[in-house]
Amino acid sequence: MKMSRLCLSVALLVLLGTLAASTPGCDTSNQAKAQRPDFCLEPPYTGPCKARIIRYFYNAKAGLCQTFVYGGCRAKRNNFKSAEDCMRTCGGAIGPWENL
């Protein structure tokens, strides 16, 4: 009798774990998208100045942070000094380092 109760308890725990994992509210990728600022969706903006500064932007189509050449003035908000700042603000992974 004790063995059948133990088996039943284990089966219920496995079932509850499976149900909890498949619940839509448990999808953290949707939560990250909902918390991403709108400016993360903007394309990279070089600006009118002529400097050639490597910066990072969040590429919403690719879902990762990539480099671009920034001219040095009139920066928009999807312009980060480091890949870590880009990822912290907009999420995603660090992508290929080639310029777009």
UniProtKB/Swiss-Prot annotation:
It is found in: Secreted. Keywords: Disulfide bond, Pharmaceutical, Protease inhibitor, Secreted, Serine protease inhibitor, Signal. Residues 22-35, 94-100 form a propeptide. Residues 40-90 form the BPTI/Kunitz inhibitor domain. The record marks 50-51 as: Reactive bond for trypsin. Residues 1-21 form the signal peptide. One of its GO terms (biological process) is negative regulation of platelet aggregation. Disulfide bonds join 40-90, 49-73, 65-86. It holds the Pfam family Kunitz_BPTI. GO terms for cellular component: extracellular space; serine protease inhibitor complex. The keyword Membrane does not apply. The keyword Plastid does not apply. SMART domains: KU (SM00131). SUPFAM superfamilies: BPTI-like. Gene3D superfamilies: Pancreatic trypsin inhibitor Kunitz domain (4.10.410.10). Inhibits trypsin, kallikrein, chymotrypsin, and plasmin. This is Pancreatic trypsin inhibitor. It comes from Bos taurus.
